[in-house]
Amino acid sequence: MNRVYKTKWSAAHQQYVVTDEHHATKGKAAKSTLAIAVASIMMATGAQAAYMEPGFVAENSTQVTEAQKSFETSEYQKDWGLTAMHASKAYALGFNGKGVTVGVMDSGALLNIHPDLTGDRFSVSSAKGEYGSVGNRYPQAVDKDKGTVGNPFNKGEEFDIDGNWKEGVNDSHGTHVTGTVGGNRDGSEFHGVAWGSNIIVGNTGATDDNNYGPFQDYEYFKAAWGDLAEKIAKANGDRGGVINNSWGTNTRVVDQKDKGHDGYNTGVHLNVNTEAETDYEFMFFAKRYGFDQTAANGIVDDKSFVYAAYEAVKDRNIVQIMTTGNRDMKNPYYRALYPLYNPAAEKHWIAVAGLKQGSKAGSYELVKNFNEAGQGKWWTVAAPGNSIYSSTTDDHGNPGYASWGGTSMAAPHVAGAMGVLMSRYDQMNALQVRDVMFTTANHKNADGTNMEGWTDVDGTVRKDGEVSDRMGWGVPDLDKGMYGPGQFLGKFEYNMAKAGSLDVWSNDISNVALDQRKAEDDAWMKATADGTKLAYGEIITGKDFVVKDGDGEGTESDRTSHIVGDHEKATLLAAYAERAQAIKDKRANDNAGYKGTLVKQGEGTLVMTGNNSYAGTTTVEGGTLLAFAESIGIDNKVTVQNGGKFGVLSSYNDQFTMKGQLVSKEAATGKLKVDIANGGTLVIDAASNVIVDSVTFNGDKKFELSLEGADGSTLAAVFNGEKDAITGSFEAKNNKAEDKLFDNLNAEAKSDFVFFDVAKATGSGNKATVTMTKKDGITVEQFAKTANEQRIASAIAASGSSLTGQILSTKKDQVSLIGDTLATLDDDFYATARNALVVNATAVSRTVMDP
């Protein structure tokens, strides 16, 4: 309880503070639902307060459903993708991307002209420099007979362009994409996913016909992505962020008259259905850009435009979002598949396939004529990408609206989702938030059936937590994503550096995907002899088709310039070697890379209540970790280092993510082992009764008392004399009496709570019992500075609400927050009453507004 209160009134969660940012509706004055909640507490006559504006943030678990509905306006419903991703849950909990900056690289955007892209949330990055090569942005358009030349560029030519839409250079694509990421929530037309985020737009210097085959200039995109990444890093700090890349089209070939694996015409498109075909596209890039397989740092020393994307983010916590492609192919094109050939890039990459609505309400399907996850499944999600309504511009800069489809429309839903999730997890970096999005993704329809397209190409039905070779992780879920990771994808170091901050994870955290990946990695290593040979017969050289690369007049040399050979094969095998080494690294130390591991760092408090089965270790290096017995994974051991604190709870009243009262099912099973280094602390909760296997102190014994397991009604009952005391126990069943585990408990068990004292703290053998009672002479009213604040304090103390629990569990180092909170409630409540937003205004006036 105590930690909820600390964070509720801090910038970490932005609630119960004067700025009250989460309650703002775009274009309207901010209103305080907290003031209304207090009004409800104070109206003993039965009159109820009501928040009349759409879009109010829930203040407790009973309000969440209503709060969700309040955000599901006609504006929200214009983009069905918001419903598919359950975005209203995030909004209802107060998370809309505010405080986070998201990047968009596209064909510019009609900023500060289009009404949904106006305001100081929107800004631009720039690309300035000289082209480093000779090439063509639209090679597929070069046709001597038709007299079309595409969009050529020459080495040494200067470029200087920013993210504003430019007539004659850009099309409407970037304007549509930017609207989906974060278009204004203003009561008209539609709004974007992360409508609270700041958006920085970069410019590809072209239209959506820009070809993302091996044709773009490295120097241009190094400058463009570099400036955008730098601006994101400046805005978000070390947390980094995301850059959405929906732009472009794939490599074309002379029509081969073939079809994709779902039966759609793909004859004019470069095929990427098999390993050999994706490897060919890699080798085609290698030939055109001159990859050097002997470079000291491996093949990533190339100068392709895709490497420029990686180069811009590799030393920052920034993620590049890439579309898989709009063709009926089993795999993504190279841009999205890049980490397959450079494993170091994987943590910086998200690939996006497309989703559409099914025929039945609440059902969804993979768009089968788009590229699927395939070999890139470990970094792929599927997102709404069919008939998406958003902002547009015509050829002359006149704003409008239209519904479009494509993976181009899917990717900005992911960028927006990342913005929302980064506002929820404000102490995680973007790479960690990416993992949260992956591991909480959804593949179920509203009726609980699997979405069409979840089943693998070979018919395997992937179980929950596994990854599909068609949909990847599934669809970003801004409901489940509010409640912590679903899996740890390796070592998860969570640094909660903000003193007094809180996070609560109630999701079950498993090891399922890592188990699946290990099996598949092992199979690949066997098939390729540890990455030393191809997993198939011979490479595709390209001799059986002709790439439309725009190279010239159709001479024999031009028609064969795409053909690869032994040099490119050697480069491919160098990439295989890098992949093999990455797998070997994960196998080291007893397959540590395939075991999800948690390291809690920083001064804040993390509470875990899920039924967790991650396979790795749990370490507390700093701050406090509180958990249910079933929340520590299959290792069943917690290591507490110097400065860290750990405690076990039998219940927890979650008013952070509004889950309400949660109860442990294994509090008495006695399976946890707790190992505490010198300087570490065991937390004993006065409202919990728990049994662990054992506790080992490797130095001085330190104890701290907690009231985290108590709900507001229990604290209020003790505080108001309706109940004598709160009593909890902690037993270590396999410690022996001679261990004298709790011999100094009474000396250590001092209360640093404002409203409660330790009545009794005893240690007998391997069991400790703690009883806490109300501190004599203390009242909530004594922290009030005005008569109005005293009335509010009295109402809070009497109510037994979640707010009561948060205040009554205050510790001494937080005491100033009590007065600040009462003052804030007084100000907000006064303003709310004056604006006639509370039913029974006469009662409100008598209660609060009297001089």
Segments (PLM) and residue ranges:
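Hydrolase catalytic cores
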Residues: 178-181, 187, 202-208, 385-467
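Subtilisin-like serine protease catalytic core
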Residues: 51-67, 78, 88-220, 236-240, ...
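Substrate-binding/access-modulating region of protease and related hydrolase catalytic domains
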Residues: 97-98, 164, 169-172, 184-187, ...
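Acidic glycine-/aspartate-rich tracts in secreted/extracellular proteins
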Residues: 23, 107-111, 205-207, 248, ...
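Extracellular S/T/G-rich loop segment that most often corresponds to the catalytic His/Ser-adjacent loop
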Residues: 106, 126-150, 338-419, 423
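Surface-exposed loop/turn positions within long extracellular repeat scaffolds
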Residues: 332-333, 593, 608-696, 711-718
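Outer-membrane translocation/initiation segment of Type V secreted surface proteins
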Residues: 6-11, 427, 439-454, 458, ...
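Gram-negative bacterial Sec-dependent N-terminal signal peptides
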Residues: 1-4, 8-50
